[in-house]
């Protein structure tokens, strides 16, 4: 029996009568992607070991040896010298095996009162907590870039659209502030998600807890968790916190995708509202004149990638009975890639927005088309006593006449306007034309949330204060 205890094999191999096949080893191993968790795995193990020593479950000398060994392993990992082994399955057993090789039996005592089930759940939460904080910072950087651009263009007039048809004049600054609002809600979702991530699973062991006199609250305090997972079965089995983060990330990417669609449209020569810096574009291998907006196009495409990860994680969880199942090994790659995709995209977009070249004249020329001030004419009539529905009908008839002539409402003389609006001619005075200018239109929307330059600047100031 003694010889069997010292026989080399997997951490659980004593139960089995034959070794795992090489094909199954490759199929079930996760070390070449979950090694990303190595540093948080060490952090969690050190907190666990300190608690074991404080509770007299392991000796103080064992703790000292574990701390010394882990410091060496951390250095090896950071220097790229650590040798990851497929035969050891995952990040946890690779580190434990190296620790035991360095310090002997003390390394074997580290796993007392712990399972890989609660260990990996702790690792993921520790890692994801840090990534949420990083993404929150990147969302702040993007919003800051948008606010800078919005402030510079508080009075730059462009057409506002509904159904991709010219609707009413707005300012470019106001348009950009819409995305600031979206990304602000994204940041709030990340903060809210973090609250549920920041709970300690360690101590749940495999599923039922442990018979050792552990102190979960001490470990939670050491690792900076807000509290512990209240139920051991739930602690090791559910990945709803990862799903919630991925859902929040999918919304970030959805907002990025909407913005990307507009950047691509605005940069098109047929629109020409903006230009992107060359470093964010590519050329064509056959057409020498091309400058393609590859970054926003690729971000638009990567949104589908993150959406796919969300569906993958939801599908992963939906059929699992309690408690832990091997299915959960598949949670990491979608989660890791979601973090990478969102973080890289936000970082690139913050820099890209700062380098946007705005073409105010092209925006203004476009806003002069499509009868963008027709609603202002209707409002003019309403303010002189006409019911809005009657004003709407009268202006719509005038628009139809102008469309047939190929002119704008502002191109009509006062006499022509009174003629086309004969039923309400008595309400139309010389001042009507001030309502039909682009500047007059945007200036009239002077209320919180409106597009007036004054309101845009106030909104920028408020948003900057909120970011502090």
Swiss-Prot record:
Main location: cytoplasm
Cell compartments where the protein resides: Cytoplasm
An annotated GO cellular component: cytosol
PROSITE patterns attached to this UniProt entry: FUMARATE_LYASES
Statement: the UniProt record of this protein carries the keyword Cell cycle: no
Molecular-function annotations in GO: argininosuccinate lyase activity
SUPFAM superfamilies from the UniProt entry: L-aspartase-like
Record EC number: 4.3.2.1
Pathway(s) the chain acts in: Amino-acid biosynthesis; L-arginine biosynthesis; L-arginine from L-ornithine and carbamoyl phosphate: step 3/3
Class in the EC hierarchy, top level: lyase
Superkingdom of the organism of origin: Bacteria
Reactions catalysed: 2-(N(omega)-L-arginino)succinate = fumarate + L-arginine
Keywords (A to Z) from UniProt: Amino-acid biosynthesis, Arginine biosynthesis, Cytoplasm, Lyase
Family, similarity comment: Belongs to the lyase 1 family. Argininosuccinate lyase subfamily.
Protein name in UniProt: Argininosuccinate lyase
Record organism: Paraburkholderia xenovorans (strain LB400)
Lineage summary: Bacteria, Pseudomonadati, Pseudomonadota, Betaproteobacteria, Burkholderiales
Record gene name: argH
């Amino acid at each position: 029996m003694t010889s069997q205890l010292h026989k080399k094999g997997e951490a659980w191999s004593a139960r089995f009568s034959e070794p795992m096949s090489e094909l199954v080893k490759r199929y079930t191993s996760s070390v070449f992607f979950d090694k990303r968790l190595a540093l948080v795995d060490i952090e969690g193990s050190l907190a666990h070991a300190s608690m074991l020593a404080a509770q007299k479950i392991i000796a103080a000398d064992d703790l000292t040896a574990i701390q010394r060994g882990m410091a060496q392993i951390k250095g090896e990992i950071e220097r790229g010298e650590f040798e990851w082994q497929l035969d050891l399955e995952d990040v946890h057993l690779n580190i434990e095996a190296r620790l035991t090789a360095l310090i002997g039996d003390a390394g074997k005592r580290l796993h007392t009162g712990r399972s890989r089930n609660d260990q990996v759940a702790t690792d993921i939460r520790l890692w994801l907590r840090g990534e949420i904080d990083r993404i929150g910072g990147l969302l702040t950087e993007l919003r800051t870039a948008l606010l800078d651009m919005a402030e510079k263009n508080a009075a730059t007039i462009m057409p506002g659209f509904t159904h991709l048809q010219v609707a009413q004049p707005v300012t470019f600054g106001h348009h950009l502030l819409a995305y600031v609002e979206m990304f602000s809600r994204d940041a709030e979702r990340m903060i809210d998600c973090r609250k549920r991530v920041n709970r300690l699973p360690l101590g749940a062991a495999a599923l039922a807890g442990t018979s050792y006199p552990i102190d979960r609250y001490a470990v939670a305090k050491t690792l900076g968790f807000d509290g512990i997972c209240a139920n051991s079965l739930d602690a090791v089995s559910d990945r709803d916190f990862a799903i919630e983060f991925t859902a929040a990330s999918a919304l970030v990417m959805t907002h990025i995708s909407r913005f990307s669609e507009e950047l691509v449209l605005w940069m098109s020569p047929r629109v020409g509202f903006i230009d992107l810096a060359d470093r964010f574009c590519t050329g064509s291998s056959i057409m020498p004149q091309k400058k393609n907006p590859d970054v926003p196009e690729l971000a638009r495409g990567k949104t589908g990638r993150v959406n796919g990860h969300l569906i993958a994680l939801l599908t992963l969880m939906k059929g699992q009975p309690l408690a832990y199942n091997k299915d959960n090994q598949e949670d990491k790659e979608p989660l890791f890639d979601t973090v990478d995709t969102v973080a890289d995209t936000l970082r690139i977009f913050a820099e890209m927005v700062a380098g946007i070249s705005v073409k105010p004249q092209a925006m203004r020329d476009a806003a002069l088309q499509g009868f963008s001030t027709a609603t202002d004419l209707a409002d003019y009539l309403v303010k002189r006593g006409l019911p809005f529905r009657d004003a709407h009908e009268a202006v719509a008839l005038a628009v139809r006449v102008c469309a047939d002539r190929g002119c704008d409402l502002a191109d009509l003389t006062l006499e022509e306007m009174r003629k086309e609006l004969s039923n309400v001619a008595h309400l139309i005075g010389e001042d009507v034309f001030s309502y039909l200018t682009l500047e007059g239109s945007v200036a009239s929307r002077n209320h919180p949330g409106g597009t007036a330059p004054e309101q845009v600047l106030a909104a920028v100031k408020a948003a900057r204060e909120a970011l502090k």
